């Protein structure tokens, strides 16, 4: 089963989520604040982090920012759960790379479970990772068979010579 790190400072709410997710069979770790969350994320390497936004010490937004810039855990899936329902807060989470942003007052416990399953079933984006296995030419070098579209000094696009001399 997937490993889930549950980060929630409200103990009673954390206990409710923990019990429900445990019933689903997830391998759970918990943290009560942002500092604990970061330490646990690096140690446990969860498949998913459920992250409260408003926490003591480090906010969920700051935790997410640190996660996305820490190579060992940068591609970990993250669901943010918060009482903050403003569009600006949701946009902030999305800009930081959250996989799903849920407003606690707008979802049931079962909605949370459904969203966890959806996020875990979504392939991790690798758009920012380099393509391995294909050597890339140095800047300004035109590979054999390609057309040079770099502008010449006069602004016209370059073209390969008709009869190249070697």
Residue ranges and their predicted role:
Residues 8:
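Conserved acidic carboxylate
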Residues 11-29:
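Two-component/phosphorelay signaling modules centered on CheY-like receiver
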Residues 30-39, 60:
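Helix N-cap/capping motif at the beta->alpha junctions
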Residues 39, 61-74:
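Short amphipathic alpha-helix used as the core "switch/output" element in two-component signaling
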Residues 44-50:
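Active-site beta3 strand of CheY-like receiver
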Residues 52, 82:
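Active-site residues of response regulator receiver
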Residues 55:
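Receiver (REC) domain active-site loop signature in two-component systems and cognate sites
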Residues 62, 85-102, 106-114, 118:
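Alpha4 helix (beta4-alpha4-beta5 surface) of REC/receiver domains from two-component response regulators
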């Amino acid at each position: 089963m997937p490993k889930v790190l549950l980060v929630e400072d409200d103990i009673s709410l954390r206990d409710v989520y923990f019990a429900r997710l445990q019933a689903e069979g997830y391998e759970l770790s918990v943290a009560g604040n942002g500092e604990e969350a970061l330490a646990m994320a690096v140690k446990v390497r969860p498949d998913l982090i459920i992250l409260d936004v408003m926490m003591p010490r480090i906010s969920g937004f700051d935790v997410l920012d640190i996660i996305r810039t820490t190579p060992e855990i940068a591609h970990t899936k993250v669901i943010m759960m918060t009482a903050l329902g403003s569009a600006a807060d949701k946009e902030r989470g999305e800009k930081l790379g959250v996989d799903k942003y849920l407003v606690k007052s707008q979802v049931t416990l079962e909605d949370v479970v459904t969203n966890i399953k959806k996020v875990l079933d979504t392939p991790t984006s690798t758009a920012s990772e380099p393509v391995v296995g294909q050597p890339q030419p140095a800047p300004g070098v035109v590979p054999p068979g390609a057309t040079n579209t770099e502008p010449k000094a006069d602004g016209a696009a370059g073209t390969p010579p008709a009869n190249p001399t070697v």
